[in-house]
Amino acid sequence: MINLKLDNETFELRNEANEITLKEFNKIYTILQSQTLGKLEQYCEVFKTLGLPEAIIYDMDNDSFIELIKSFNAMTITSELPAKEIELNGYKYVAYTGDEFKFKTKDLIEIEKSAKRGVTNFPSFILAIIFKRADLTVNEHYEKSHLELKAKLFEDNVKADFAIPYITLVAKKTLKSLEDGK
């Protein structure tokens, strides 16, 4: 949490992954991926998403704003190990068994499709694709409406720190594929 003191008033800006909801994280992700916003405007939108008043943001001097961006980006990640399973609404969702997470080809195909479609809640979709219920068939699991419903379920029930290890794995896998020319 960043405490920002301006004009004799203190404002709190959440910048830790365990303080930010997955729904907010989806918005932040979409803002930071925007091709139409400049970098400063992106951070203005991010800070507004996290509750900092627009008037305060736009009234800051540039040096203070840049320092705020640097402080915000100093987020600490508490765990790099992805969760194996989670229970939501009475259902157990499992990402992997065994000691280590490995991508399934179908998961990567669906993640790639979601990215190309430009879904606005891409981090939630990553979780929706990776976490599966044992009582569903493969076809049921990958059904678009099921994935949308499950993405919303994750948005409503987890913080960003739950999703970040998986997003990191997807990013690393994508970079490796690009480096390998795949």
Regions found by a protein language model. Give the residues of each.
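Charged interaction scaffolds used for protein-protein
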Residues: 1-182
